[in-house]
Regions:
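A short, Lys/Arg-rich alpha-helix, primarily the initiator
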Residues: 1-27
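Short, charged recognition helix plus adjacent turn
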Residues: 2-9, 70, 78-85
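Short alpha-helical elements of helix-turn-helix
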Residues: 16, 32, 48, 62-66
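Generic non-transmembrane alpha-helical segments
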Residues: 17, 21, 33, 37-41, ...
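Short alpha-helical DNA-recognition segment
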Residues: 27-52
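DNA major-groove recognition helix of helix-turn-helix/homeodomain DNA-binding modules
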Residues: 37, 61-78
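DNA major-groove recognition helix of helix-turn-helix
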Residues: 54, 64, 83
Length: 85
């Protein structure tokens, strides 16, 4: 069965960006804190789901992407930008 993958082979494009943005925030934001903020937006994610998203092991829905953009105070473009080396 074919599964859609990002060029990097991960299940999402936004995971690396979510991790980078979260780690750049001041004060630093933990995965647990981010999960709590997402729950306040009505998105039921726990710390483990955040970890799987950031590592690219889990898909991200458009509803979740919208909430991530709001919680992290960034644009959709910031979350979907593909990193080039």
């Amino acid at each position: 069965m074919y599964k859609n993958k990002a060029k990097s082979g991960t299940n999402n494009i936004s995971g690396n960006n979510i991790a980078r943005i979260r780690k750049e925030m001041y004060p630093k934001v933990s995965q647990r804190f981010l999960a709590d903020k997402m729950q306040l937006e009505g998105i039921e994610l726990d710390k483990n789901a955040i970890q799987r998203i950031e590592s690219g092991a889990r898909f991200v829905t458009d509803i979740e992407l919208k909430a991530f953009a709001k919680v992290l105070d960034v644009s959709y473009e910031d979350l979907l930008a593909e990193q080039t080396l």
